[in-house]
Amino acid sequence: MTFYGKDISGLHADLVAKKVSATELTKAAFDRIKATDDQVGAFLALNEEAALKQAAELDQAGIAEDQLLAGIPLAVKDNIVTKGLTTTAASKILENFKPVYDATVVEKLNAAGVINVGKVNLDEFAMGSSTENSAFKTTKNPWDLTRVPGGSSGGSAAAVAAGDVLGALGSDTGGSIRIPASFTGTVGMKPTYGRVSRWGLIAFGSSFDQIGWLTQSVKDNAILMSAIAGKDDRDMTSANQPVPDFAAGLNDQADIKGMKIAVPREYMEGLDDDVQEVIEASLKHLESLGATIDEVSLPHTKYGVPAYYILASSEASSNLQRFDGIRYGFRADDVKNLEDVYVKTRSQGFGDEVKLRIMLGTFSLSAGFYDAYFNKAAKVRRLIAQDFDDVLKDHDLIVGPTGTSTAFKIGAEIADPKQMYFNDVLTVTLNMAGLPGMSIPAGFSKDNGMPIGLQMIGKRFDEATIYKAGYVFEQTTDFHKQTPELG
């Protein structure tokens, strides 16, 4: 059994009616993982014994009508802490690290009866766009095993695209949910900054990071988002905003007639031909469904990537100071003194990309360069946020491509950090402004057959409008129904 064509509501109905058991679903997930993961490499750790025990307990107690997520197998990105289950952030410096507590989002899922089947791969400390920066393995794209799944939540996207699970938690600092969703033909939502607690997320850029979902369908994404959203007193950046039922209204009556959609001209520049063709067809389809399409400008988009990498790397250089070999994690051998512990532990424990970003961030924050780099980047961030506000005053959504290309070949860009960074040109600005955005399947390349994603951006705390538009688009196309051919 795969989870292709399945959905949370349907599986829940079967669980309540005892047409299927939580144990059967959980075993099916592990059978599928074992059948595909030698090829794909999505998982870093399996939680099989604990998951089957939890499933048996749910079956014994029975699953009630109001326990929508009970018995549903899902996966967790390995930079989100899980009590007693290794959490490595795909870094040697945290190899074999077992946290003593659960992240808030994991607590909420546990309380809802979700079955965590395991932890999935990522770029080390979520720094990357291809999942090639993991210290442990390179995850492959289920649509073409010679190509990347995107990053940094590549393991999450690959697990969903491979039919291992219906959904997987990811995190998005500059596109790390949306780019993998686009590359793998899945649905990826980065919610508004503050919508979901970051407590228990291993920090990369604290003012950029946000936890979200990768799923096979828009409705499942909406259901799961409602389950993890909300204020958390342990995270001072989480917002005290009411959490709607995001899936309410996602039915046959949903429509987008009269919805005002903005398309930034900057987002339609420099696209591969196949991406441009798919996005233009998607915009025409939205128009045929009753939306109005306006061309607009987000003039500071071109400054987004350099400003983002200065700011996010500066935050990373601070956040990663805690990994020093003293309290937990990897510690180098053959050290002579305390300074030696720090230097050798960090030199041996961090990968090249992490070291590069620490150095960039430290340089940007150093005396004599702070004003020239960090302060200027912070000003650009404010201008980018203002651009979005100006457009969204008169529009319901901003729509465009998620990325400029389809998934690239493994190894094609890893040696050129600058080229890799510019894969994020259409996603980083959203994190700088703290807005919600979702990538949904919009078509396939005629050139290489790879998926192409459409990005929908909304107003702060208005994920509901994004879900509505995404659902209507999804239900009037069949791109989400197509699946890769895996053994």
Swiss-Prot record:
GO terms for biological process: translation. One of its GO terms (molecular function) is glutaminyl-tRNA synthase (glutamine-hydrolyzing) activity. The keyword rRNA-binding does not apply. It catalyses: L-glutamyl-tRNA(Gln) + L-glutamine + ATP + H2O = L-glutaminyl-tRNA(Gln) + L-glutamate + ADP + phosphate + H(+). Keywords: ATP-binding, Ligase, Nucleotide-binding, Protein biosynthesis. It holds the Pfam family Amidase. It comes from the Bacteria. It is an enzyme of class 6 (ligase). The active site is at K77 (charge relay system), S152 (charge relay system), S176 (acyl-ester intermediate). SUPFAM superfamilies: Amidase signature (AS) enzymes. Its EC number is 6.3.5.7. GO terms for cellular component: glutamyl-tRNA(Gln) amidotransferase complex. HAMAP family: GatA. Belongs to the amidase family. GatA subfamily. Allows the formation of correctly charged Gln-tRNA(Gln) through the transamidation of misacylated Glu-tRNA(Gln) in organisms which lack glutaminyl-tRNA synthetase. The reaction takes place in the presence of glutamine and ATP through an activated gamma-phospho-Glu-tRNA(Gln). PANTHER family: GLUTAMYL-TRNA(GLN) AMIDOTRANSFERASE SUBUNIT A, TRANSAMIDASE. Heterotrimer of A, B and C subunits. This is Glutamyl-tRNA(Gln) amidotransferase subunit A. It comes from Limosilactobacillus fermentum (strain NBRC 3956 / LMG 18251) (Lactobacillus fermentum). The gene is gatA.
